């Protein structure tokens, strides 16, 4: 399946559910308490992040989609912190604030990137379902997807009225379910239980075929449009009536924290479906996003640039021939990993041993090598009639096949100054016997603190000589 970045800016989503505040106390531990055999944490940083349904809305906004949120809080500083964080992220939030009840807070004590303790401050909310339904109905206009983010904390009391209200307007309903009774989600377009939640309803699944059979039966029993079971390190499985099961492997390279991974899945699904993507493509994007977010510590959101870079890697543009936009994204990703970018340029009309040796030497100056290639018109202007021998597409394809080369891009001008000013490599490399100041673009690179290097050419290796020899023979 070919992945592409949706137009999230045209995908408004409404989230309704249990909001909470994820609070982190970070500090160092260097001694054991004299009062009890427990570590003493000297707190030096307090961090608040939206959690639960608020994290779903935050994830949707981080992807660039317009996000609205309806939830229930207390009348306290935790609710104020939530409201401020969401407003800063561009999320429109409407809270039903209840006096004499605390906003749900999950406090985690962290040291050296390890969670030592979690303390929960919560009481089940006594909400007004009619008032909440009225708020939802007023915000459904113009929305393309409704998300029910259910943590079983009391914000969602009348699931069916919300599902039916959205369906009456032709709005898909996605639900992240909770509890032992999934009948409350009857008629939803899609529900996204994890494997444990799914098996609580249908019983233990002995193998994949059993999971599929039980899932299809649940689809029919609850009149669901689709069912997505998230399965941790085994990826996720999408089930639809009359369609083959779609199994997607897990994408995580390293797992640091699974907190909020389910929120990332449903938020990416919702934003992608709202943007007009079909369900298999939306699920593939959600799987990719989940693989990124579990590599982060704590409740975290995935940004649009992160997802775009992941798509580029997935589609094979981590290496090879790129356009300028793809190249700039690849460079951003490389720099995020502290990689040094090397740049060289030329016509590379007939690739020979001298070129290969030179490119290997250039690659050794850093971690990633960009080769910028003159297009056909500029080669003709530089080299004269009859050149190039090979078209720019063929020249770039050959260069992209070399192990020393990471990215290849063409440029139309006679010199690469315009490209250099946008790419801003750490090292500019040129082959020849002239001084550094004579290298075209050296002034641009040196102006922002980059390095310019001149490498010697391999003797008796020349494209011009090869062309002349061919013509004589």
From Swiss-Prot:
Homodimer. Pathway: Nucleotide-sugar biosynthesis; ADP-L-glycero-beta-D-manno-heptose biosynthesis; ADP-L-glycero-beta-D-manno-heptose from D-glycero-beta-D-manno-heptose 7-phosphate: step 1/4; Nucleotide-sugar biosynthesis; ADP-L-glycero-beta-D-manno-heptose biosynthesis; ADP-L-glycero-beta-D-manno-heptose from D-glycero-beta-D-manno-heptose 7-phosphate: step 3/4. Keywords: ATP-binding, Carbohydrate metabolism, Kinase, Multifunctional enzyme, Nucleotide-binding, Nucleotidyltransferase, Transferase. It comes from Pseudomonas putida (strain GB-1). This is Bifunctional protein HldE. The gene is hldE. GO terms for molecular function: ATP binding; heptose 7-phosphate kinase activity; heptose-1-phosphate adenylyltransferase activity; phosphotransferase activity, alcohol group as acceptor. In the N-terminal section; belongs to the carbohydrate kinase PfkB family. InterPro entries: Bifunc_HldE, Carboh/pur_kinase_PfkB_CS, Cyt_trans-like, PfkB_dom, RfaE_dom_I, RfaE_dom_II, Ribokinase-like, Rossmann-like_a/b/a_fold. The active site is at residue 263. GO terms for cellular component: cytosol. The keyword Kinase applies. Catalyzes the ADP transfer from ATP to D-glycero-beta-D-manno-heptose 1-phosphate, yielding ADP-D-glycero-beta-D-manno-heptose.
């Amino acid at each position: 399946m070919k992945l592409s970045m949706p137009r999230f800016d045209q995908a408004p989503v409404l989230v309704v559910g249990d909001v909470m505040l994820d609070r982190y106390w970070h500090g160092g531990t260097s001694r054991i308490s004299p009062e009890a055999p427990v570590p003493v944490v000297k707190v030096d940083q307090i961090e608040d992040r939206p959690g639960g349904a608020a994290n779903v809305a935050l994830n949707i906004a981080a992807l660039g989609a317009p996000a609205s949120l309806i939830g229930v809080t207390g009348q306290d500083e935790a609710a104020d912190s939530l409201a401020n964080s969401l407003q800063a992220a561009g999320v429109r939030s409407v809270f039903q604030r209840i006096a004499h009840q605390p906003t749900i807070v999950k406090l985690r004590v962290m040291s050296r990137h390890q969670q030592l303790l979690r303390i929960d401050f919560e009481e089940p909310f006594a909400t007004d379902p009619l008032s909440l339904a009225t708020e939802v109905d007023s915000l459904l206009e113009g929305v393309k997807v409704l998300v029910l983010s259910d943590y079983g904390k009391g914000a969602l009391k009348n699931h069916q009225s919300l599902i039916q209200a959205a369906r009456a307007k032709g709005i898909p309903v996605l639900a992240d379910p909770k509890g032992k009774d999934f009948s409350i989600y009857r008629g939803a377009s899609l529900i996204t239980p994890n494997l444990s939640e799914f098996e609580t309803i249908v019983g233990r699944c002995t193998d994949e075929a059993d999971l599929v059979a039980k899932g299809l039966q649940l689809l029919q029993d609850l009149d669901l449009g689709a069912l997505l079971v998230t399965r941790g390190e085994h990826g996720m499985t999408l089930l639809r009536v009359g369609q083959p099961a779609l199994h997607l492997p897990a994408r995580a390279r390293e797992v640091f924290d699974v907190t909020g991974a389910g929120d990332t899945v449903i938020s990416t699904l919702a934003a992608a479906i709202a943007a007009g993507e079909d369900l298999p493509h939306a699920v593939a994007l959600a799987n990719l996003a989940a693989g990124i977010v579990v590599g982060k510590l704590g409740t975290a959101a995935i940004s649009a640039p992160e997802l775009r870079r992941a798509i580029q890697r997935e589609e094979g543009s981590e290496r090879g021939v790129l356009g300028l936009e793809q190249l700039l994204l690849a460079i951003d990703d490389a720099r995020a990993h502290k990689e040094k970018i090397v740049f060289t340029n030329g016509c590379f009309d007939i690739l020979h041993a001298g070129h290969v040796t030179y490119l290997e030497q250039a690659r050794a100056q850093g971690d990633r090598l960009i080769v910028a290639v003159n297009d056909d018109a500029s080669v003709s202007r530089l080299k004269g009639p009859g050149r190039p021998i090979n078209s720019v597409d063929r020249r770039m394809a050959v260069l992209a096949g070399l192990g020393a080369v990471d990215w290849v891009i063409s440029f139309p001008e006679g010199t690469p100054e315009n490209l250099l000013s946008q790419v801003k490599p750490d090292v500019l490399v040129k082959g020849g016997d002239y001084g550094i100041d004579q290298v075209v673009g050296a002034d641009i690179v040196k102006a922002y603190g980059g390095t310019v290097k001149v490498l010697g050419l391999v003797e008796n290796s020349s494209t011009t000589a090869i062309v002349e020899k061919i013509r004589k023979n």
